[in-house]
Amino acid sequence: MTNSSMFCPIYRDLEPFTYFFYLVYLIGIIGSCFATWAFIQKSTNHRCVSIYLINLLTADFLLTLALPVKIVVDLGVAPWKLRIFHCQVTACLIYINMYLSIIFLAFVSIDRCLQLVHSCKIYRIQEPGFAKMISAVVWLMVLLIMVPNMVIPIKNIKEKSNVGCMEFKREFGKNWHLLTNFICVAIFLNFSAIILISNFLVIRQLYRNRDNANYPSVKSALLNILLVTASYIICFVPYHAVRIPYTLSQTEVISDCSTRIALFKAKEATLLLAVSNLCFDPILYYHLSKAFRLKVTETFASPQKMKAREEKPRRENDVQSTGSAC
């Protein structure tokens, strides 16, 4: 370990971030619990989007398990063993959630694209059985990438206040961490391209059919696309703009102390945006899942509005959620 890394106070002054992480956690746990209750109460016919959203919700619960530990550690009040546990386990859970969220948002975009652009044809990818299979493959892939960071043996170091997770790693652990980061950036870039291309094709199709009587819900569909795209960009793009430079500072390719401190603070700020997907996801559930939307309406609408809603004939087939294929 070099003198620069030994005496560079990188991991100080994290308390301001913890308040925002706590706010995200509080909003997110309420939204996730309500979403779970809504999906359980309202039986769904397991359309593709519903399957992907349920997987997204499951990933969000991993994040709700990890955030309290991160908050306690960053406040500097965690015992030494909890700090080690955070570096080995809960920090990895945060990234498992992040990349599962990215991948399942991409599958939501693909499904909506096929529903609207190729509405007369059903592809295998649109079948519920295939959606369940691909979801299992996604979980397995992400876990195979991330779990080694949890189980690779770590070093025993003397207890101190200003310590980062990389300092616990042996040489093989550092190399695997570096490899994991580059794999995750590749996942981000590939699935970002999928989301952007899918949404572009949907917008183009909606624009071409803007005067068609069969497209009465164009505005709602566009709103859904904008929600998915905006939440994706806000949550995940800033973090990945910082991730590679920050990883290089962890491996001391970037050794200047002030630069390393700035990159760490930028990483924490953009990680805060990334975990804020925990707050955005319930909004996506509302717009993309009919079961969730109906349960929210039943819970918060007045009896008069509910009665009027029940008397109102169904004029749409949930264009804004998944379409008709699955």
Curated annotation (Swiss-Prot):
<feature type="transmembrane region" description="Helical; Name=3">
    <location>
        <begin position="90"/>
        <end position="110"/>
    </location>
</feature>
<feature type="transmembrane region" description="Helical; Name=4">
    <location>
        <begin position="134"/>
        <end position="154"/>
    </location>
</feature>
<dbReference type="GO" id="GO:0008528">
    <property type="term" value="F:G protein-coupled peptide receptor activity"/>
</dbReference>
<dbReference type="GO" id="GO:0005886">
    <property type="term" value="C:plasma membrane"/>
</dbReference>
<feature type="transmembrane region" description="Helical; Name=7">
    <location>
        <begin position="269"/>
        <end position="289"/>
    </location>
</feature>
<dbReference type="GO" id="GO:0045638">
    <property type="term" value="P:negative regulation of myeloid cell differentiation"/>
</dbReference>
<dbReference type="InterPro" id="IPR017452">
    <property type="entry name" value="GPCR_Rhodpsn_7TM"/>
</dbReference>
<feature type="topological domain" description="Extracellular">
    <location>
        <begin position="70"/>
        <end position="89"/>
    </location>
</feature>
<dbReference type="GO" id="GO:0060259">
    <property type="term" value="P:regulation of feeding behavior"/>
</dbReference>
<feature type="topological domain" description="Cytoplasmic">
    <location>
        <begin position="290"/>
        <end position="326"/>
    </location>
</feature>
<dbReference type="GO" id="GO:0007186">
    <property type="term" value="P:G protein-coupled receptor signaling pathway"/>
</dbReference>
<dbReference type="GO" id="GO:0045028">
    <property type="term" value="F:G protein-coupled purinergic nucleotide receptor activity"/>
</dbReference>
<dbReference type="InterPro" id="IPR000276">
    <property type="entry name" value="GPCR_Rhodpsn"/>
</dbReference>
<keyword id="KW-0297">G-protein coupled receptor</keyword>
<keyword id="KW-0812">Transmembrane</keyword>
<feature type="compositionally biased region" description="Basic and acidic residues">
    <location>
        <begin position="307"/>
        <end position="318"/>
    </location>
</feature>
<protein>
    <recommendedName>
        <fullName>G-protein coupled receptor 171</fullName>
    </recommendedName>
</protein>
<dbReference type="GO" id="GO:0007188">
    <property type="term" value="P:adenylate cyclase-modulating G protein-coupled receptor signaling pathway"/>
</dbReference>
<keyword id="KW-0472">Membrane</keyword>
<keyword id="KW-0675">Receptor</keyword>
<feature type="topological domain" description="Cytoplasmic">
    <location>
        <begin position="204"/>
        <end position="221"/>
    </location>
</feature>
<feature type="transmembrane region" description="Helical; Name=2">
    <location>
        <begin position="49"/>
        <end position="69"/>
    </location>
</feature>
<keyword id="KW-1003">Cell membrane</keyword>
<dbReference type="InterPro" id="IPR048077">
    <property type="entry name" value="GPR171"/>
</dbReference>
<feature type="topological domain" description="Extracellular">
    <location>
        <begin position="155"/>
        <end position="182"/>
    </location>
</feature>
<feature type="topological domain" description="Extracellular">
    <location>
        <begin position="1"/>
        <end position="19"/>
    </location>
</feature>
<keyword id="KW-1133">Transmembrane helix</keyword>
<dbReference type="Pfam" id="PF00001">
    <property type="entry name" value="7tm_1"/>
</dbReference>
<feature type="transmembrane region" description="Helical; Name=6">
    <location>
        <begin position="222"/>
        <end position="242"/>
    </location>
</feature>
<keyword id="KW-0807">Transducer</keyword>
<feature type="disulfide bond">
    <location>
        <begin position="87"/>
        <end position="165"/>
    </location>
</feature>
<feature type="topological domain" description="Extracellular">
    <location>
        <begin position="243"/>
        <end position="268"/>
    </location>
</feature>
<dbReference type="GO" id="GO:0051930">
    <property type="term" value="P:regulation of sensory perception of pain"/>
</dbReference>
<comment type="function">
    <text>G-protein coupled receptor for Big LEN, a 16-amino acid neuropeptide produced from the precursor protein, proSAAS (encoded by PCSK1N). Acts through a G(i)-alpha-mediated pathway in response to Big LEN. Big LEN-GPR171 system plays an important role in regulating feeding and metabolism. Also plays a role in modulating fear and anxiety-like behaviors in the basolateral amygdala. Big LEN-GPR171 modulates the mu-type opioid receptor signaling and antinociception. Acts as a negative regulator T cell function.</text>
</comment>
<feature type="topological domain" description="Cytoplasmic">
    <location>
        <begin position="111"/>
        <end position="133"/>
    </location>
</feature>
<keyword id="KW-1015">Disulfide bond</keyword>
<comment type="similarity">
    <text>Belongs to the G-protein coupled receptor 1 family.</text>
</comment>
<dbReference type="GO" id="GO:0042923">
    <property type="term" value="F:neuropeptide binding"/>
</dbReference>
<feature type="transmembrane region" description="Helical; Name=5">
    <location>
        <begin position="183"/>
        <end position="203"/>
    </location>
</feature>
<feature type="region of interest" description="Disordered">
    <location>
        <begin position="305"/>
        <end position="326"/>
    </location>
</feature>
<feature type="transmembrane region" description="Helical; Name=1">
    <location>
        <begin position="20"/>
        <end position="40"/>
    </location>
</feature>
<feature type="topological domain" description="Cytoplasmic">
    <location>
        <begin position="41"/>
        <end position="48"/>
    </location>
</feature>
